[in-house]
Amino acid sequence: MALRLEDKKAIVAEVNEAAKGALSAVVADSRGVTVGDMTGLRKTARESGVYIKVVRNTLVKRAVEGTDFECLSETFTGPTLIAFSNEHPGAAARLLKDFAKAQGNFEIKAAAFEGELIPASDIDRLAKLPTYEEALAQFMMTMKEASAGKFVRTLAALRDQKEAA
């Protein structure tokens, strides 16, 4: 079904608005995925703070012009699904990577983070970024281990002083 010019402009504006507020983007080929599976993916995406849209290539190229995701323009071939992470940079990559494992015919093409194109082979780099809570927990564990080590060294120095006296 052909889209009217007003509809095309609305789609471009919607995707452009999503791109401006996004931290990262992932492009995938959804050819062969059933409607039920796509509906499940969209539901999971909403819960994860990820915006997903299947858009015509010409429209998505216009939508990402002037954004950090312009580097993805070369990947807009064939059926294009674009996912923007709004809350965490790795959310869309993690979501689509897990979905691709479950679906044999779902292929991730590329991703973008801070204006850098990330090929599909390196998608793990983005998917494995810790969430804010995970990063905070890692930091606290580092601080805890550092203070425990300092405490042990202080006790060892105190023991050495008492032995010397």
Swiss-Prot record:
* Subunit structure and binding partners: Part of the ribosomal stalk of the 50S ribosomal subunit. The N-terminus interacts with L11 and the large rRNA to form the base of the stalk. The C-terminus forms an elongated spine to which L12 dimers bind in a sequential fashion forming a multimeric L10(L12)X complex.
| GO MF annotation: an example | large ribosomal subunit rRNA binding
User: Which Pfam families does the record match to this protein?
Assistant: Ribosomal_L10
Domain of life of the organism encoding this protein: Bacteria
* Keywords for this protein: Ribonucleoprotein, Ribosomal protein, RNA-binding, rRNA-binding
State any GO BP term from the record.
translation
> Which purpose does this protein serve, as stated in its record?
Forms part of the ribosomal stalk, playing a central role in the interaction of the ribosome with GTP-bound translation factors.
Name of the protein = Large ribosomal subunit protein uL10
Keyword Glycoprotein in annotation = no
A GO cellular component term found in this entry reads: large ribosomal subunit
The record's annotation in SUPFAM superfamilies points to: Ribosomal protein L10-like
Q: Which gene encodes it?
A: rplJ
Family to which the UniProt record says this protein belongs: Belongs to the universal ribosomal protein uL10 family.
Among InterPro entries, the record links this protein to: Ribosomal_uL10, Ribosomal_uL10-like_sf, Ribosomal_uL10_bac, Ribosomal_uL10_bac_type, Ribosomal_uL10_CS_bac
What NCBIfam families does the entry give?
A: PRK00099.1-1 (NF000955)
PROSITE patterns recorded: RIBOSOMAL_L10
